[in-house]
Amino acid sequence: MCLMEKKILICGHRSFVATGLINKFKTAGIDFDCFSRGKEERNGNVVTGDVFLMHQNSELSENYDIVVNYILLKGKSVEENLQYCQSLLQFCKDKHVKHLIQISSISVYPNESLEVDETSAIEEDYHNKGGYASIKVAVDHYLMEHPIGGLQVSFVRPGYIYTKNQDISKAGILVSKFGLNILLGDKRTTLPLICREKIHEALLRIIQTDKKESVYLLLNKDKEEGTKYNFVIRQWNVKPICLPYFFLMVIAKGLKSIGIAKQHHYLKIVGLFKRTWFNSAKTEQALNLDLGKRKIAVIG
């Protein structure tokens, strides 16, 4: 089946990461619909409705070949996000979907991992992650543990996402107070980056490619380029004060050993000093795509 004969559904098309994908699909001549939260109705190729009852939405009456899922219910519990996943999988089963492309994140990997590629296992316990990452871990496990006959699931795991001409967020990277710039990490803390437009290009190639991979890592794999410290110096032209690695790790290990700090508390400290190198070479080869170095970064 050629690309123009495929029917695609984009779930969560209004998200930051998805912005611009619609124009990319239109230019490529792709037949697609969009779905997001709201009153149950259809406006052109945009359908809204209850995400927990997606499989019962009467406006999504067609069969689809591919579903691209961006939806993550921020401010909702892990259980509520899994409830949406249950409806999503039922929808895929009912509509004979052949390929589900799940927009995941590199945050699903264990904080203590030293090297990650497309074959690496993700974090086993979502409680070891905070907020956003915990939901991503739980959702990925749910999708892997509930296979649907005839449906292939691909996990697209991008690094920290940036795009042009938007305000830069320091969240999770730098705290600037009272004339001081405190790096949330040290000189070796990794921060792999990926341009949003590069993600869209990769998605188009995933859709076009007959051989589907289970995991795609989308990020710049350059070790020197991908650190918080270098990013902050280039982006904000400041030399930040680093957190003391050995001091904080000794305290964290001590509190854990006497039972004051739980494992998930300890791992969050480890996450501040993440040393993980993400090797996206297999993805670049599979998609014939150079993920390259950044030129301007905005964290999304």
Language-model regions, residue ranges each:
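N-terminal Rossmann NAD(P)H-binding glycine-rich loop of SDR-like oxidoreductase domains
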Residues: 8-28
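NAD(P)H-binding glycine-rich loop region in Rossmannoid oxidoreductase-like domains
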Residues: 44, 48-87, 91-94
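Conserved Rossmann-fold NAD(P)-dependent oxidoreductase catalytic core, especially the SDR/UDP-sugar
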Residues: 87-131
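Catalytic helix-loop patch of NAD(P)-dependent Rossmann-fold dehydrogenases
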Residues: 114-161
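Glycine/proline-rich active-site loop of Rossmann-fold NAD(P)-dependent oxidoreductases
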Residues: 137, 162-173, 205-216
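NAD(P)-dependent short-chain dehydrogenase/reductase
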Residues: 149-191, 196
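Mid/C-terminal beta-alpha module of Rossmann-like enzyme folds, strongest
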Residues: 202-263, 300
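C-terminal amphipathic/interface module of NAD(P)-dependent oxidoreductases
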Residues: 242, 262-300
